[in-house]
Curated annotation (Swiss-Prot):
SUPFAM superfamilies: Cu,Zn superoxide dismutase-like. PROSITE patterns: SOD_CU_ZN_1 (PS00087), SOD_CU_ZN_2 (PS00332). It catalyses: 2 superoxide + 2 H(+) = H2O2 + O2. Homodimer. InterPro entries: SOD-like_Cu/Zn_dom_sf, SOD_Cu/Zn_/chaperone, SOD_Cu/Zn_BS, SOD_Cu_Zn_dom. Pfam families: Sod_Cu (PF00080). This is Superoxide dismutase [Cu-Zn]. Its cofactor is Cu cation; Zn(2+). It comes from Drosophila busckii. Cu cation binds at H37, H39, H54, H111. It is found in: Cytoplasm. One of its GO terms (cellular component) is cytoplasm.
Length: 145
């Protein structure tokens, strides 16, 4: 992840039927919640803005990770303590590293503000979670481990 927020995040999935484990660390975050999403395009030519909207191949509304009606890329929030790196530890059953809806080649984005999980009543709640500016992003690639 590069930008005002920086870090390394790993996406692991043992098989198509298993959830994706998302782990890593992000630095440069103010204390509090920060929206954490997979966006549609693996394009950072104009910084994080070129990554497009949240990855949403099923055309659903924005929601919480536990909601049935959510973008595939809606991974909720990560919590920064303000003391050192922010740990990322997410297990998600909707995203995948396999098939047509794979997130490989797309962009993970960290936002400046909390994701209201589609429940904030703001005009952006049902599209972006009103999570604010994109302060860090990186293309999801394949790593040799």
């Amino acid at each position: 992840i590069n930008g005002d927020a920086k870090g390394t995040v790993f996406f692991e999935q043992e098989s198509e039927k298993c959830p994706v484990k998302v782990t890593g660390e992000v630095t440069g975050l103010a204390k509090g919640l920060h929206g954490f999403h997979v966006h549609e395009f693996g394009d950072n030519t104009n910084g994080c803005m070129s990554s497009g909207p949240h990855f949403n191949p099923q055309g659903k509304e924005h929601g919480a990770p536990t909601d049935e009606n959510r973008h595939l890329g809606d991974l909720g929030n990560i919590t920064a303590t303000g003391d050192g790196p922010t740990a990322v530890d997410i297990c998600d059953c909707k995203i995948t590293l396999f098939g047509a809806n794979s997130i490989i080649g797309r962009t993970v984005v960290v936002h400046a503000d909390p994701d209201d999980l589609g429940k904030g009543g703001h005009e952006l709640s049902k599209t972006t979670g009103n999570a604010g500016a994109r302060i860090g992003c990186g293309v999801i690639g394949i790593a040799k481990i």
